[in-house]
């Protein structure tokens, strides 16, 4: 008997979970932990509560975090990449590790922990770094989007920080309200904006969701090869570097990140420049999904002939 689409999605998710758990490495912390990048010694990540930072107002903070069962060290690497682009006297760059709690068979359980617990812990640890930060940029993939959304809500209540959320293919479990992601109360003295980079894979619309409180951009068509739920966390760091990292699975592939003259990804952040951020604030949220596409190659009826001769 042929399998129904819902059954295929369930099987695909289960196989992903089994594979990821089997090959997971780099032991996570026993409890969710915030790390920040430090220059000395040895250019490394240190637990935020062990860093000798003065508790100060006016800091800019950017934090990346993962989603359900992820082996890749992309949040840590992204924090280092951004740190290399900004003034370290003005920015704190780091990543939030809750992998121990994300290593569960059901992604719904990971999203539940992210929403109910991890977000609060992330907010608490950020506010230990700065009582009243100037600007907060939180970046997350999949289930982790619930953690940064909840953290942002707490930070918005307790500070006057400008808040930027970057959702990488947010996962919204069946029955959950997608409109609660990034639903930050609007106040005259606060600035909030979010971008959401989404795609589809073999699970169909499991993560393909337009968010009401984010600027929605479909990057599926610019994926090198098959569309992949994990592609956004390979793509976004590449927009920081201007190319895919030499150690990335997409190393050497062409990077696309424009819609017309507008650049997406890292270019939409304050880290990329004040003018970039101010331009982002003019982009609508809850928009019809914008689709990035590879530029069409000019038609060359004899191109195949010369290509064959060169081979």
Where are these regions (language model features)?
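Active-site and glycan-interaction determinants of carbohydrate-active enzymes
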Residues: 244-259
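Short, aromatic- and cysteine-enriched interfacial helices/patches
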Residues: 3, 301-309
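Bacterial N-terminal signal peptides
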Residues: 11-20
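A domain-start/cap signature at the N-terminus of enzymes
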Residues: 25-52
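Proline/glycine-enriched tight loop/beta-turn segments at coil->beta junctions
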Residues: 54-60
């Amino acid at each position: 008997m042929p399998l129904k689409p819902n059954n295929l999605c369930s099987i695909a998710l289960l196989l992903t979970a089994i594979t990821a758990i089997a090959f997971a490495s780099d032991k996570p912390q026993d409890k969710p932990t915030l790390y920040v990048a430090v220059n000395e010694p040895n250019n490394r990540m240190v637990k935020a509560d062990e860093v000798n930072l003065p508790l100060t107002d006016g800091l800019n903070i950017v934090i990346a975090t993962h989603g359900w069962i992820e082996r890749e060290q992309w949040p840590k690497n992204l924090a280092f990449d951004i740190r290399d682009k900004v003034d370290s006297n003005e920015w704190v760059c780091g990543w939030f590790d809750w992998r121990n709690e994300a290593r569960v068979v059901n992604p719904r359980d990971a999203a539940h922990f992210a929403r109910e617990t991890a977000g609060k812990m992330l907010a608490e640890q950020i506010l230990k770094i700065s009582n009243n930060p100037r600007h907060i940029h939180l970046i997350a993939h999949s289930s982790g989007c619930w953690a940064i959304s909840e953290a942002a809500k707490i930070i918005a209540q307790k500070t006057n920080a400008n808040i930027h959320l970057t959702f990488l293919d947010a996962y919204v479990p069946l029955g959950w309200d997608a409109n609660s992601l990034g639903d930050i109360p609007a106040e005259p003295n606060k600035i909030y904006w979010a971008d959401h980079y989404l795609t589809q894979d073999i699970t169909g619309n499991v993560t393909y969701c337009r968010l009401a409180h984010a600027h929605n951009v479909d990057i599926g068509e610019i994926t090198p090869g098959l569309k992949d739920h994990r592609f956004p966390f390979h793509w976004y760091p590449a927009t920081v570097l201007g190319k895919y990292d030499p150690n990335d699975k997409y190393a050497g592939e062409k990077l696309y990140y424009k819609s017309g003259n507008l650049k997406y990804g890292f270019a939409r952040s304050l880290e990329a420049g004040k003018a970039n951020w101010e331009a982002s604030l003019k982009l609508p949220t809850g928009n019809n999904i914008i689709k990035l596409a590879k530029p069409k190659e000019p038609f060359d009826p004899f191109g195949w002939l010369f290509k064959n001769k060169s081979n």
